[in-house]
Amino acid sequence: LQKGLQLSFFRSRKLSDQEYFFNSYFDELSVRLRDVSADQLGELSQVFVNVRDKGGKVIIIGNGGSAAIASHVAVDLTKAARVRAINFNEADLITCFGNDYGYENWMGKALEFYSDAGDVAVIISSSGESQNVVIGAKAARDLGLQVVTLSGFRADNSLRAIGHLNLWVNSESYNIVETTHQSWLLAVIDRLVEAGQ
């Protein structure tokens, strides 16, 4: 199991019983997918529609698995929903800005260089505590961007306090949190496509 997996229901029975493990795992995932309301996802949908209609773009950032989500969602937003979206996953960009400004500052500096007035920053972090993500979110606010955060773990994590719209997963399992974040974002894209927006 991934280090740090802290879901209590996994401890109530031996993990050698794979049927129990997977049933419990998917039950928990199903519950966590409902940590957000339809109104919140509808609000995010409208954020995307508004930025597109105003000629802006969505910038999606994260570390590790969250960066992978950023790549997937940026492509689908652009291609399927016609909302221009980018991410900052290029190794040359990360190493350049990390080397010149410090790893903790690279996201904030990249936002400074690549964002335009009226853009939206979607900032993803399972823990909501990664220093570069928190600094990046604060930089986005300072730049006047609309900030959407997706986080998990503690309800009072640092990232969740920064965004204009904050979506939170009540779990301390990285994979549960990341799968939920990606599912929420892709559901919003599918909703935009279905609604013809």
Language model features: what each stretch is:
Residues L5-V36, E172:
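Generic N-terminal amphipathic, Lys/Arg-enriched alpha-helix
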Residues R34-K54:
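A short, well-structured juxtamembrane/interface segment
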Residues V47-S115, V120:
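Glycine-rich, small/polar surface segments that engage phosphate groups of diverse ligands
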Residues S66-S71, E129-G136:
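Short glycine/serine/threonine-rich phosphate/pyrophosphate-binding segments
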Residues T78, A137-R141:
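Surface-exposed amphipathic alpha-helices with a cationic face
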Residues N89, S125, S151, L167-N175:
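Short beta->alpha connector loops at strand-helix junctions that form conserved
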Residues A121, N175-Q197:
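A charged, well-structured terminal subsegment
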Residues L150-G163:
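Short, glycine/polar-rich helix-capping loops at beta-to-alpha or helix-loop-helix junctions
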